[in-house]
From Swiss-Prot:
Family matches, as HAMAP family: PyrG (MF_01227)
Taxonomic lineage: Bacteria, Pseudomonadati, Pseudomonadota, Gammaproteobacteria, Legionellales
Sites where the protein binds CTP: 13, 146-148, 186-191, 222
Matching SUPFAM superfamilies: Class I glutamine amidotransferase-like, P-loop containing nucleoside triphosphate hydrolases
Note: CTPSs have evolved a hybrid strategy for distinguishing between UTP and CTP. The overlapping regions of the product feedback inhibitory and substrate sites recognize a common feature in both compounds, the triphosphate moiety. To differentiate isosteric substrate and product pyrimidine rings, an additional pocket far from the expected kinase/ligase catalytic site, specifically recognizes the cytosine and ribose portions of the product inhibitor.
The name this protein goes by in its record: CTP synthase
Entry-linked Pfam families: CTP_synth_N (PF06418), GATase (PF00117)
Record GO biological process: 'de novo' CTP biosynthetic process; pyrimidine nucleobase biosynthetic process
Residues annotated as catalytic: 378 (nucleophile), 514, 516
Reactions mediated catalytically: UTP + L-glutamine + ATP + H2O = CTP + L-glutamate + ADP + phosphate + 2 H(+); L-glutamine + H2O = L-glutamate + NH4(+); UTP + NH4(+) + ATP = CTP + ADP + phosphate + 2 H(+)
Annotated gene: pyrG
GO cellular component: cytosol
Gene Ontology terms for molecular function: ATP binding; CTP synthase activity; glutaminase activity; identical protein binding; metal ion binding
Record comment: activity regulation: Allosterically activated by GTP, when glutamine is the substrate; GTP has no effect on the reaction when ammonia is the substrate. The allosteric effector GTP functions by stabilizing the protein conformation that binds the tetrahedral intermediate(s) formed during glutamine hydrolysis. Inhibited by the product CTP, via allosteric rather than competitive inhibition.
Length: 555
């Protein structure tokens, strides 16, 4: 029997419902329960796949190829469960599926309404996503009081009626602000938020109160009195430097035990020793390395959320504080590579569109020519190949057909644009990896023996997640290999380039997939760990050169 924990948010958005849900999931998992998490998004887009990163932040790709909310990345980083397309759905998806059923005649000519048809579809999707787990944590996106969230709130209200309070539990996350002018903590916003929730039939069982500092006992008692929540169930969650402290903070306040008590679950004590080790390693670094992330969405750091977390994870596993310098690739186009001179390593992440591309190419060239560790992910690998083709293979104006459809040397292109020497356009059968459509999800990669990639992974075959349309052009790759480009990873059928490196460079690696999606704080990821180690080595080498005595003779 699956128990359901519904997490809602009030007062303001961006309080950290995703992190709180994931942290509670980590606690319950440490208590011996199998856990899954779902995110319900109230926007009408079917999924975030076509949304601007500035609007939505990162699109997280699941193993089964779904484009989902970035909160699913938090879920996978905190718990051991692997998320699927069933773990995230939107209002748009719900309505699309209901309309499809109506067109098919499933409702036998009935009038389709929000209640019961939309709410029934929401409940069915929640049950489907929760199937097989002891506990399903269901995060409802948006803020209580928003009109967009009402169908989701009505659906979970109905689930409490249908399943009872031994199988369902409501947690409400609110803001308790500190008003500096008055010198007081204000509980009124939380009181009103709970009042709004109760007005639609939901009484929270537990409150998690977000604040700058820990709530004094008097304020917790006041909140309990006016919200009809027992005082032990009013949890204080103050700001912390690292999100990986939160499972420990919530465990120490008894949240996991409180949940198990209310849901009548017999569970063991939560063993969070691995989280303690993560936090201790993050708080006590022995080294510092500066990494430039050269991208086009750098004004919103959530656009690269999994990437920044993967770098932090690598720092945890190398006892290193990783300082991330986000650099707009258009700024490099305007001001040159001077912006890169103070960094120890350069990373160019994925992206779409031509804006800022030449700046990324300049960054790859700067790293290659100056022996600076370079990590190119997805588009970052493709622009490294473009730069190499132009400079080392004398392919003038080489490019991707995404940016220049008329380029004489399409080193990156849709598979349907590849043309063999005989003038025949490459054709793919149904079921093949199609370059003309988005290639999504986990796919196997075979690594070259004696390559850096093979040494980093420690195995000859890996599965990594993809999100791209364009591929490296096999018809031109042979010329690049003659000039020193190493193809260190290929698809299992040998037709698609998955990884590249340079043999004559200290650390220059590109991958077509997104390794950041599978990095976790407890395990890290071999490519990111190798990258940070290379950055540290480059930093030490630079210091040694600067410290060496001058060779010039003086009178």
């Amino acid at each position: 029997m699956t128990r359901y924990i519904f997490i809602t948010g009030g007062v303001v958005s961006s309080l950290g419902k995703g992190i709180t849900s994931a942290s509670l999931g980590a606690i319950l998992e440490a208590q011996g329960l199998t856990v899954t998490l779902l995110k319900l998004d109230p926007y009408i887009n079917v999924d975030p796949g076509t949304m601007s990163p500035f609007q939505h932040g990162e699109v997280f790709v699941t193993e089964d190829g779904a484009e989902t909310d970035l909160d699913l990345g938090h879920y996978e980083r905190f718990v051991n469960a692997t998320m699927t397309r069933k773990n995230n759905f939107t209002t748009g998806r719900v309505y699309a599926d209901v309309i499809r059923k109506e067109r098919r005649g499933d409702y036998l000519g009935g009038t389709i309404q929000v209640i019961p048809h939309i709410t029934d579809e929401i409940k069915a999707k929640i049950r489907e996503g929760a199937d097989g787990a002891d506990v399903a944590l269901v995060e409802v996106g948006g803020t209580v009081g928003d009109i967009e969230s009402l169908p989701f709130l009505e659906a979970i209200r109905q689930m409490r009626i249908e399943l009872g309070d031994q199988q369902t539990l409501f947690i409400h996350l609110t803001l308790v602000p500190y008003v500096a002018v008055a010198g007081e903590i204000k509980t009124k916003p939380t009181q009103h938020s709970v009042k709004e929730l109760r007005s639609i039939g939901i009484q929270p069982d537990i409150l998690v109160c977000r604040s700058e500092q820990s709530l004094p006992d008097a304020e917790r008692a006041k909140i309990a009195l006016f919200t009809n929540v027992p005082e032990p169930s009013v949890i204080s969650l103050s700001d912390v430097k690292s999100i990986y402290e939160i499972p420990l903070i919530l465990r120490d306040q008894g949240l996991g035990n409180r949940v198990c008590e209310k849901l009548n679950i017999k569970a063991t004590a939560a063993d969070l020793d691995d989280w303690k080790k993560v936090v201790q390693a993050q708080k006590n670094p022995r080294h510092t390395v500066t990494v430039a992330v050269v991208g086009k969405y750098v004004d919103l750091e959530d656009s690269y959320k999994s990437l920044s977390e993967a770098l932090i994870h690598a720092g945890i596993h190398t006892q290193t504080r990783v300082v991330i310098e986000y650099i707009d690739s258009e700024a490099i186009e305007l001001h040159g590579t001077e912006l890169l001179k103070k960094v120890d390593a350069i990373l160019v992440p994925g992206g779409f569109g031509s804006r800022g591309i030449e700046g990324k190419i300049l960054a790859a060239q700067y790293a290659r020519e100056n022996g600076i560790p370079y990590f190119g992910i997805c588009l970052g690998m493709q622009i490294a190949i473009i730069e190499f083709a132009r400079d080392k293979a004398q392919m003038e104006n080489a490019n991707s057909t995404e940016f220049d459809p008329k380029t004489p040397f399409p080193v990156v292109a849709l598979v349907s644009e590849w043309m063999a020497k005989e003038g025949i356009i490459e054709k793919r059968k149904w079921g093949d990896d199609l370059g003309g459509t988005m290639r999504l999800g986990g796919q196997p990669c075979r690594l070259k023996i004696d390559s850096l990639a093979r040494r980093l992974y420690g195995e000859d075959r890996v599965i990594e997640r993809h999100r791209h349309r364009y591929e490296v052009n096999n018809d031109l790759i042979g010329e690049l290999e003659k000039k020193g480009l190493v193809i260190s990873g290929r698809s299992i059928d040998d037709r698609l380039v998955e990884m590249i490196e340079l043999a004559d460079h200290p650390w220059f690696v590109g991958c077509q997939f997104h390794p950041e999606f599978t990095s976790t704080p407890r395990k890290g990821h071999p490519l990111f760990i190798g990258f940070i180690k290379a950055g540290l080595a480059a930093k030490e080498a630079k210091k040694a050169v600067l410290a060496a005595p001058s060779q010039e003779k003086t009178d």
